[in-house]
Swiss-Prot record:
Gene Ontology cellular component annotations, sorted alphabetically: cytosol
Keywords noted in UniProt: Aminoacyl-tRNA synthetase, ATP-binding, Cytoplasm, Ligase, Nucleotide-binding, Protein biosynthesis
EC number: 6.1.1.15
GO biological process, one term: prolyl-tRNA aminoacylation
Protein name listed in UniProt: Proline--tRNA ligase
Length: 571
């Protein structure tokens, strides 16, 4: 591509509404332009990157044996009513009617459509397993679109859906897709982690997310220093460490006027928050008569409750809800001053986090306003109904696989795979005939990659103060050739044209910057755009038989012979 025939839409200033670095650089590098809130036009520079991501994803999906389809963005609302998600999905689902007053939705995902396809086209177990995928536009009516294409309303996804006769067959395809995703993100040049994840609103049994590690990520990822273990913090198990020591202190109550938070209480008492417990009084599962019990959750003072873990306890109501003031009054409890003493005797279930369960001589609420208890010990002073993993892991915790300790970094979710089971096939009646001639409900998996989000995530991981530093596989151009003063020097232009043709013939994606611009402008644009290799051709270099080469990550340029240059580019 000749730069004189290409749209350079670079900006020198950062737009005020661009918060994260990827949004800033995508605008400045001329990759995207905002059309409306959460809607972006992809310019030629951005489209080139997008198509390269698209190509790698498509190659690996085809390699996995999946078959490409293409489904409508517009979907009949009746399918979503069948699945039960028409109301459940909430305001992110854009609903509208056509001129005939038929209700439709703009698809945020395609489980319903693909299941409808499968129930009409798949008739026998002999057709299973099968895996369909598409690369298609989605629309989610985000209440606050932000971060550019990272959280936009319209975006491109690769979504795949597999259909199986057995759970074992689903597991096999799930493992294939796990490996396929790992190959995709490796080829994209990203530092990523596959992590155990919650299944969320889509539902199902097993789930893994693929996260690109970046400081701007919205999710906390816990991973081992010595193994491949990685999990979303909401899913990472907090391992029990140590044993409870014997009591050494007497139990007593102390006045703590107006000291309600753990930090305030511990500072007032000159105590370590690690030697305190805090209570969270929540609603339990209602009994047959509709009575809702109170459940007391106790954690170490310096730890945070993991709501997802708490909701998985069979005695805790989901979604998690705090006990009402009326419920607290019925047991004579005061918010902010609740301790475990006497709760079991009052009929309250006391669930204690693992780390809190091994404390002795700790600080707790006194179950009286403006008082706390010190020297509290389990069994002697307070009873435990059950010990349960309730907290978020923290950096330095032992890895659950027994290898190393946990590090915690921010991650950007770019892929997600689920074992859906029969959630959608059951709801939409997707059945095939088995070996015995009887119909059975198929089991499903689904596998998504945010194609547009991958582009932004790659930038969040690869940039400096000059601009983007693309991994070569997805750079808009791999090589930029800059002939110095080409409009005045036919010799440099001729040499540049010859090298341009030679590198293109070798399969490189090359930009010949033949614009009538100052060298400084060209260099700034090329660094901003993140092109991995820059070759400058000048009169002095031609006289010496060398080319000036600079890799995008290099601090300094170097003069190379043509043979050295070609060897460098071939690596």
């Amino acid at each position: 591509m000749r730069a004189s025939r290409f749209l350079f839409a670079t900006l020198r200033e950062t737009p005020n509404d661009a918060e994260v670095i990827s949004h800033q650089l995508m605008l400045r590098a001329g990759m995207i332009r905002k059309l409306a809130s959460g809607l972006y036009t992809w310019l030629p520079m951005g489209t080139r990157v997008l198509k390269k991501v698209d190509a790698i994803v498509r190659e690996e999906m085809n390699r996995s044996g999946a078959m490409e389809v293409f489904m409508p963005v517009t979907q009949p609302a009746s399918l979503w009513e069948e699945s039960g998600r028409y109301e459940q999905y909430g305001p992110e689902l854009l609903r509208f009617k056509d001129r005939h007053d038929n209700p439709f939705v703009l698809g945020p995902t395609h489980e319903e459509v693909i299941t409808d396809l499968a129930r009409n086209e798949l008739k026998s177990y002999k057709q299973l397993p099968v895996n369909f995928y598409q690369i298609q536009t989605k629309f989610r009516d985000e209440i606050r679109p932000r971060f550019g294409v990272m959280r936009s309303r319209e975006f491109i996804m690769k979504d795949a859906y597999s259909f199986h006769a057995t759970q074992e067959s689903l597991q096999e395809t799930y493992d294939v897709m796990y490996d396929t995703y790992s190959r995709i993100f490796t080829r994209l040049g990203l530092d990523f982690r596959p992590v155990q994840a919650d299944t969320g609103s889509i539902g199902g049994s097993a789930s893994h997310e693929f996260h690109v590690l970046a400081a701007s990520g919205e999710d906390d990822i816990a991973f081992s220093t010595e193994s491949d273990y990685a999990a979303n913090v909401e899913m990472a198990e907090a391992v029990l460490v140590g044993e409870r020591a014997a009591p050494t202190q007497e139990f007593k109550l102390v006045e703590t006027p107006n000291q309600k938070t753990i930090a305030d209480v511990c500072q007032f008492l000159n105590a370590d928050p690690k030697q305190s417990v805090k209570a969270l009084l929540v609603q339990g599962v209602a009994d047959e008569k509709g009575n809702v019990p109170v459940v007391a959750l106790f954690l170490r003072g310096d730890h945070e409750l993991n709501e997802i873990k708490a909701e998985k306890h069979p005695l805790v109501a989901a979604p998690l809800a705090f006990a009402t003031e009326e419920q607290l009054q019925a047991f004579g409890l005061t918010a902010g001053f609740t301790g475990p003493q006497g709760l079991v005797e009052k009929g309250i279930t006391v669930i204690v986090d693992r780390a809190a369960s091994v404390l002795s001589d700790f600080v707790a609420g006194a179950n009286e306003a403006d008082k706390h208890a010190v020297g509290v010990n389990w069994e002697r002073d307070a009873q435990i109904t059950e010990v349960f993993d309730l907290r978020n892991v923290v950096e330095g915790d032992p890895s659950p696989d027994g290898k190393g300790t946990l590090q915690i970094k921010r991650g950007i979710e770019v892929g997600h795979i689920f074992q859906l089971g029969t959630k959608y096939s059951e709801a939409l009646g997707c059945k095939v005939l088995g070996e015995d001639g009887k119909p059975f409900t198929v089991t499903m998996g689904c596998y998504g990659i945010g194609v547009t989000r991958v582009v932004a995530a790659a930038i969040e991981q690869n940039y400096d103060d000059k601009g983007i530093i693309w991994p070569q596989a997805i750079a808009p151009f791999e090589i930029a050739i800059v002939p110095m003063n080409a409009h005045k020097s036919p010799r440099t232009l001729e040499a540049a044209e010859a090298l341009y043709a030679e590198l293109q013939a070798q399969g490189f994606d090359v930009l010949l910057d033949d614009r009538n611009e100052r060298p400084g402008v060209k260099f700034s644009d090329l660094e901003l755009m993140g092109i991995p290799h820059r070759i400058v051709i000048g009169e002095k270099g031609l006289d010496a038989g060398t080319f000036e080469y600079k890799g995008r990550r290099d601090a300094e340029a170097s003069n190379l012979t043509k043979e050295e240059l070609l060897a460098k580019l071939a690596r």
